[in-house]
Amino acid sequence: MSGIFGALRLPASVLFGSGQRAAIGMMTAQIGKRALVCTDARMGQDVQFKAIVADIAANGVEVKVYDRTEADLPMAGITACVQEYANYKPDVVLGIGGGSCMDMAKCVAVLLQHGGSLRDYYGENKIPGPVAPVIAVPTTSGTGSEVTPVAVIADTERGTKVGISSPYLIPRVAVCDPELTLTCPPGLTAVSGADALTHAIESYTAARREVTADLAVKNVFVGKNALSDMFGLLALKNI
């Protein structure tokens, strides 16, 4: 096949702007009546985070918080969260924080829906079907996990980080409120910016793949294309 090819896989809703965190409670209530929020210990004590959780509850949603997400997302932490809330059966899982918190929400959504071990899903397109809806709320500016079909975890037994990739991992909703990044430590802000720059460079310089009708059906990663070029170059200019 020849000609222009482009592919985008995105959440059903992406909200961006200062103060948009005020929509999280309403968006959650549109999806279900029981919510599980995944975050880390620092964010769990944040005033803005507590206000978000209170707003979810004020919208008539029962909400539980798991605030023990660790950096780089060791598999044991994911397993612990799933075991703790399996009987709760949340209708929606929220990841609020950095990339590890959002990836925690994605992995928990997979295991609550399909069971098994995370190792069953290593690689590309191993998730057999839809997972519990995820709402992703980044509090750093670099990961991009709020709009991607990827989760990265640390398999400590194997001593490596592993990716799980599937369109089913794309969050239902992404809420990007720049005000949530203002309390991010300066060092983490710098690293997050470098991370965002790296993602943009990788997008723009990726190798092209042969374009076929089933390229985006059989593959999560479709290579360099017209749309990735457009957004990658825009990101490079803005960063």
Predicted regions and their residues:
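ATP/NTP phosphate-donor binding region
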Residues: 1-92
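A glycine/threonine-rich phosphate-anchoring loop and its flanking beta-alpha core
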Residues: 12, 113-212, 220
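Conserved active-site and cofactor/substrate-binding residues in soluble primary-metabolism enzymes
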Residues: 19, 23, 47, 51, ...
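Structural signal for hydrophobic packing residues in well-ordered secondary-structure cores
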Residues: 28, 32, 56, 60, ...
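Short Gly/Thr/Asp-enriched flexible loops that form oxyanion-binding sites at enzyme active sites
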Residues: 52, 82, 101-114, 147-148
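Glycine-rich phosphate-binding loop
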Residues: 90-103
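Active-site segments that bind and position negatively charged phosphate/pyrophosphate groups
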Residues: 209-239
